[in-house]
Amino acid sequence: MSNTDKERAIAAALAQIEKSYGKGSVMKLGQRPHVDIEAVSTGSLGLDIALGIGGIPKGRIIEIFGPESSGKTTLTLHLIAEAQKKGGTCAFIDAEHALDPAYAKKLGVNIDELIISQPDTGEQALEIADTLIRSGGIDMIIIDSVAALVPKSEIEGEMGDAQMASQARLMSQALRKLTASINRTNCITVFINQIRMKIGVMFGSPETTTGGNALKFYASVRIDIRRIGSIKDKEEVIGSQTKVKVVKNKVSPPFKTADFDIMYGSGISKEGEIIDLGVKLDIVEKSGSWFSYKNVRIGQGRENVKQYLKEHPQISNEIEKIIREKSSKITNINLDQTGEEND
């Protein structure tokens, strides 16, 4: 077949596909209009930079996982607050039946506008999510958590009944169904997941996430969040030091890390990140316990400087802007070359 005949055959095939499935259903990649990936901020300056595009991408599946009390729900509530600031409509599928509205409000979530569902079974949770996503009116949906998506067969069965891989099958089927709708409606779908230990692992990490392997493959971004220390005021613990690692990223280079403080009652400390990243990039000068900006001392001790930045938002915003402009340097500093994904 000559090149001309090939081109005619392809053109006829493309025309037939467009006639059957609508305009835009198939095209050459070069003809597709290039659109920059839109992102929603995570509420953490360091994590936004680590993700490479300024936040989590729209129209993608995201997995946030970690041990108990590591800050998974706090991070997703910040995501909702940031999406709502941009005028987005958000939904929260609370399969764990553990969402605290008062805490969500403290983190900046408009609880009057947040759609919430507390389903009885895993099938019900995923059907509700599917219906909301297909509506086209939801910008972000959070499913908390994969471990709590218990199949109906398990709930209706007897205690001790073996339900081998029923949850993994449920997740695999649901994700096959959801993926196309998520992409078409540009809805961010965030799954919160827990960590379990694999039995009999001799080499490598024994940790794994619940719900089988399907979510690992379908997720465009996977974020591992860990509590690495406590923040104390004298003897009282007032927060936790947190490390996040982007273990999978289909929209930017993976394995970047970020550190931030989660303060009890108020969530991620933006001021703490501005200080740490400012010092790292030589925007804020640190001499002993004193911190200076533009040769002017702004406080002694990290907690005092955090308070100063809270009271002077114009200086805080100015430093943040410079940090974002120099973000490429931060990603080089935070790049973890040793990380590998186990899927």
Curated annotation (Swiss-Prot):
Keywords: ATP-binding, Cytoplasm, DNA damage, DNA recombination, DNA repair, DNA-binding, Nucleotide-binding, SOS response
InterPro entries: AAA+_ATPase, DNA_recomb/repair_RecA, DNA_recomb/repair_RecA_CS, P-loop_NTPase, RecA-like_C, RecA-like_N, RecA_ATP-bd, RecA_C_sf
Source organism (scientific name): Rickettsia massiliae (strain Mtu5)
Subcellular location: Cytoplasm
Keyword Cytoplasm: yes
Pfam families: RecA (PF00154), RecA_C (PF21096)
Binding site for ATP: G66, P67, E68, S69, S70, G71, K72, T73
Identification of the protein by name: Protein RecA
Family designation: Belongs to the RecA family.
SMART domains: AAA
Gene name per UniProt: recA
UniProt record, GO biological process: DNA recombination; DNA repair; SOS response
Any single Gene Ontology cellular-component annotation: cytosol
Function: Can catalyze the hydrolysis of ATP in the presence of single-stranded DNA, the ATP-dependent uptake of single-stranded DNA by duplex DNA, and the ATP-dependent hybridization of homologous single-stranded DNAs. It interacts with LexA causing its activation and leading to its autocatalytic cleavage.
GO MF annotation list: ATP binding; ATP hydrolysis activity; ATP-dependent DNA damage sensor activity; damaged DNA binding; single-stranded DNA binding
Keyword ATP-binding in annotation: yes
Coiled-coil segments on the chain, per record: none
